[in-house]
């Protein structure tokens, strides 16, 4: 005889999950509204979930919490760690003394909370939520593109020349070595006698 009113228990809140609101993951059931990252509380789906010891995370938080750590294992811009590679025999650079800069913005708010830096491409103010640092300078996310082809860049995929940023392909075409045997790939080399 069937048990009426029963259902699986939610893996997050422990209450009964009915079929219309059920999300299944790793053999467990969740309410749609409970299927959230344990750290940032972002909504998850089958393409964004990562599981560790029966806890669910978005891929970004999972990588920060359980991913590889140490020299050479960055998870992209903004998640750099402080391992300087001393165990590998790499000698750390001596720390440079802090030199305060003069902020030309004289508003009391800007002096107290920091004025907005200027984007290296368009010259407009760049605020923290939209700022990317590349080649040591601030950029808007939309301005952080190759100066030649307009391709969107990441801090690890850019090259810089004379204050401008380029994708590796455009940099090689425009500023790389020139002459016989360069720039066409190994299949285009010709042996002339």
Swiss-Prot record:
Record GO terms (molecular function): metal ion binding
Regions that span the bilayer: none
Pfam families according to UniProt: LIM (PF00412)
Gene Ontology CC terms: nucleus
GO biological process, alphabetically ordered: cell differentiation
InterPro entries associated with the record: Znf_LIM (IPR001781)
Positions occupied by motif Nuclear localization signal: 64-69
Compartments where located: Nucleus
Alphabetically ordered keywords of this record: Acetylation, Developmental protein, Differentiation, Isopeptide bond, LIM domain, Metal-binding, Nucleus, Repeat, Ubl conjugation, Zinc
Residues the record lists as N6-acetyllysine modifications: 112, 131, 137, 161
PTM annotation (N6-succinyllysine): residues: 137
Ranges where the LIM zinc-binding domain occurs: 10-61, 119-170
Main location: nucleus
Chain's role: Drastically down-regulated in response to PDGF-BB or cell injury, that promote smooth muscle cell proliferation and dedifferentiation. Seems to play a role in the development of the embryonic vascular system.
Subunit structure: Interacts with KAT14. The LIM domain 1 is necessary and sufficient for this interaction. Interacts with GLRX3.
The protein, known as: Cysteine and glycine-rich protein 2
């Amino acid at each position: 005889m069937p048990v009426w009113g029963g259902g699986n228990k939610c893996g997050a809140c422990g209450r009964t999950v009915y079929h219309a609101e059920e999300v299944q993951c790793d053999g467990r059931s969740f309410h749609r509204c409970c299927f959230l990252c344990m750290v940032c509380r972002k909504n998850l789906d089958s393409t964004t979930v990562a599981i560790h010891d029966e806890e669910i995370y978005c891929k970004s938080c999972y990588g920060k919490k359980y991913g590889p750590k140490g020299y050479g294992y960055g998870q992209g811009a903004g998640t750099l760690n402080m391992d300087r590679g001393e165990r590998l025999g790499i000698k750390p650079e001596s720390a440079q003394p802090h030199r305060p800069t003069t902020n030309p913005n004289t508003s009391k708010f800007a002096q107290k909370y920091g004025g907005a830096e200027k984007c290296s491409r368009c010259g407009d103010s760049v605020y923290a939520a939209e700022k990317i640092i590349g080649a040591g300078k601030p950029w808007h996310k939309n301005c952080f593109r190759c100066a030649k082809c307009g391709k969107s860049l990441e801090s690890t995929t850019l090259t810089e020349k004379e204050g401008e940023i380029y994708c590796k392909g455009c940099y090689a075409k425009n500023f790389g070595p020139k002459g016989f045997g360069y720039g066409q790939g190994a299949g285009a080399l010709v042996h002339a006698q």
